[in-house]
């Protein structure tokens, strides 16, 4: 049976574009009857072993894990991960970039769950300069990039641009970074 995807075959994986991945997710939700919230739960939980392995190999293994979340479904994946880290007793902090009211339904439900648990979290306005990201990342064992994911169709600017620039700089300096979906500095349409 052939595939409608134009994905590129690699040794182990088929690579797809952002629009193709969105189509696969929609097909899974609609045709197979798997709710979006369950996909989000699976994606967030699947990040846990990799985050813990990266933390163990970090020179700052006892430092806090920072989960950087945007206001889309990719951010929702990060919120699920944050809940699981908190349940495991792992030192972590969730930073939501943007307004809570901008979260889609499934992500908002996960934000509410995280708040009910009392997990360390904060909301940062997109245009905020209140955080010195470079300084914060020196106190971080692993940064989880759940900011933009496959839905990005515009230029990165403002607070996101400053955050991503600091994240890339810190990564070059040794910070462990794990992306949910794809790194925010990559364009998903290619």
Predicted regions and their residues:
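Glycine-rich phosphate/dinucleotide-binding loop and adjoining beta-alpha-beta core of small-molecule
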Residues: 3-16, 58-190
């Amino acid at each position: 049976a052939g595939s409608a995807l134009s994905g590129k075959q690699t040794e182990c994986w088929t690579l797809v574009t952002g629009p193709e991945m969105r189509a696969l997710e929609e097909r899974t939700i609609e045709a197979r009857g798997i709710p979006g919230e369950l996909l989000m739960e699976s994606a967030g939980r699947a990040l846990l072993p990799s985050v813990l392995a990266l933390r163990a190999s970090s020179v700052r293994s006892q430092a806090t894990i920072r989960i950087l979340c945007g206001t889309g479904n990719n951010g929702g994946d990060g919120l699920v991960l944050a809940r699981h880290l908190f349940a495991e007793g792992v030192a972590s902090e969730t930073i939501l970039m943007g307004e809570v009211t901008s979260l889609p339904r499934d992500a908002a439900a996960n934000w509410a769950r995280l708040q009910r648990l009392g997990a360390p979290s904060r909301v940062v306005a997109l245009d905020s300069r209140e955080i010195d990201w470079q300084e914060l990342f020196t106190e971080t064992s692993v940064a989880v990039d759940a900011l933009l994911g496959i839905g990005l169709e515009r230029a990165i600017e403002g607070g996101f641009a400053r955050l991503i620039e600091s994240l890339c700089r810190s990564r070059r300096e040794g910070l462990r970074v794990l992306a949910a979906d794809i790194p925010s500095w990559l364009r998903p349409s290619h």
